[in-house]
Amino acid sequence: MTGKPSIAALIVAAGQGVRSGGGVPKQYRRIGGKAVLAHAVDALARHPAIGSVQVVIGAGQEDLHAEAVGGRTLPPPVTGGATRRDSVIAGLAAVDADIVLIHDAARPFLPAAVIDRLIAALDGSDGAVPALAVADTLAKGDALLGDAVPRDGLHRVQTPQAFRRADILAAHRAWDPAREATDDAQVARAHGLSVAIVEGDRSLEKLTFAADFEAAEERMAMISRTAMGFDVHGFTAGDGVQLGGVRIAHDRALAGHSDADVALHALTDALLGTIAAGDIGSHFPPSDQRWKGADSAMFLAHARDLVAAAGGIVDFVDLTIICEAPKVGPHRAAIRDRIAALLGLTAGQVSVKATTTERLGFTGRREGIAAQAVATVRVPSI
């Protein structure tokens, strides 16, 4: 291939089956705290060669999709058709790229190296698929074992499958609708396209049965991370402060570009720290006029959503407010309840404390308020 073609990913997530259990289609079941679909989206979206990720969903799955991939920047989902081929055609029509990688949502564990191999293989073929050589003995039979089937040259074909978009779209449109294809490579070959085999990966196994999800959960064993946030704001003229999302009357106000809620700022940094996502200033720079006077609850909600997008689960947060005045004690319960509501936690998962510096330092001189927060979050081990 010449030049640098644009590359998009197309995730087929239109299935309606619930035989894997869980009460929802398998692409929306959660493993490691994150929907199967979200794992697939993230694996493709973080690859530097892929410019966009388009998801095809089933009719009536809009809410499930929104919940699964919330917090991510994606094009609107496309609604698929009655068959997988119909869904792929709908998705291909919505994609604007030279090359497309078509992936089954039920394969959440996609190594970047597989994507690299697929893209490279298109230099010498019309399409490329990842596959693993069959290692087990194959045999015919029902209740009784029949004859063995020679396994030489047999492969288990996986996804994603890579093609030039125009080629695979033409192949799908030319396919006999009376027949149902098992994958896109079958459609491509029937249209005369060459399809290369690249090395697949055992982690790309498709999730189908309840036992598959049990194995995936073991793979996604959660680990605990703890991070700290700290913030300071000085006093200025005013008649009250915002602390932990609660308005408290006072003879002064806190100075800051936003509403200067020092408690929520510290807590936001703590949450961002658990997923190594920088600090509040990198997401909401004080030089940006959009955040002038902004409600800091928005900042905390953003950090919460980023943690969720990473598959994280917030277990506990601890907040210490350091000041001589105003007195925090009378407002402690309200602050705790407000933070719990913002993070979707119970009151028992939020600790709010207050202390002074015994009249030492800037807080002791009543020049401002400091806050320190600690967040404990479970995240997937991979």
Curated annotation (Swiss-Prot):
EC nos: 2.7.7.60, 4.6.1.12
Record InterPro entries: IspD, IspD/F, IspD/TarI, ISPD_synthase_CS, MECDP_synthase, MECDP_synthase_CS, MECDP_synthase_sf, Nucleotide-diphossugar_trans
Pathway: Isoprenoid biosynthesis; isopentenyl diphosphate biosynthesis via DXP pathway; isopentenyl diphosphate from 1-deoxy-D-xylulose 5-phosphate: step 2/6; Isoprenoid biosynthesis; isopentenyl diphosphate biosynthesis via DXP pathway; isopentenyl diphosphate from 1-deoxy-D-xylulose 5-phosphate: step 4/6
Database matches in CDD domains: CDP-ME_synthetase (cd02516), MECDP_synthase (cd00554)
Chain positions of site Transition state stabilizer: R19, K26, H257, T356
Gene Ontology MF terms in the entry: 2-C-methyl-D-erythritol 2,4-cyclodiphosphate synthase activity; 2-C-methyl-D-erythritol 4-phosphate cytidylyltransferase activity; metal ion binding
Region (2-C-methyl-D-erythritol 2,4-cyclodiphosphate synthase): 225-382
Coiled coil: none
Sequence segments annotated as region (2-C-methyl-D-erythritol 4-phosphate cytidylyltransferase): 1-225
Cofactor(s) essential for the protein: a divalent metal cation
Amino-acid positions noted as binding 4-CDP-2-C-methyl-D-erythritol 2-phosphate in the UniProt annotation, renumbered to this chain: D231, V232, H233, H257, S258, D279, I280, G281, T355, T356, T357, E358, F362, R365
Residue positions binding a divalent metal cation: D231, H233, H265
Site (Positions MEP for the nucleophilic attack): R151, K206
SS bond list: none
Keywords for the protein's UniProt record, in alphabetical order: Isoprene biosynthesis, Lyase, Metal-binding, Multifunctional enzyme, Nucleotidyltransferase, Transferase
UniProt entry tagged with the keyword Repeat: no
Catalytic activity: 2-C-methyl-D-erythritol 4-phosphate + CTP + H(+) = 4-CDP-2-C-methyl-D-erythritol + diphosphate; 4-CDP-2-C-methyl-D-erythritol 2-phosphate = 2-C-methyl-D-erythritol 2,4-cyclic diphosphate + CMP
Biological process (GO), any one: isopentenyl diphosphate biosynthetic process, methylerythritol 4-phosphate pathway
General function of this protein: Bifunctional enzyme that catalyzes the formation of 4-diphosphocytidyl-2-C-methyl-D-erythritol from CTP and 2-C-methyl-D-erythritol 4-phosphate (MEP) (IspD), and catalyzes the conversion of 4-diphosphocytidyl-2-C-methyl-D-erythritol 2-phosphate (CDP-ME2P) to 2-C-methyl-D-erythritol 2,4-cyclodiphosphate (ME-CPP) with a corresponding release of cytidine 5-monophosphate (CMP) (IspF).
Similarity comment: family membership: In the N-terminal section; belongs to the IspD/TarI cytidylyltransferase family. IspD subfamily. In the C-terminal section; belongs to the IspF family.
Record-given protein name: Bifunctional enzyme IspD/IspF
Taxonomic lineage of the native organism: Bacteria, Pseudomonadati, Pseudomonadota, Alphaproteobacteria, Sphingomonadales
This protein's encoding gene: ispDF
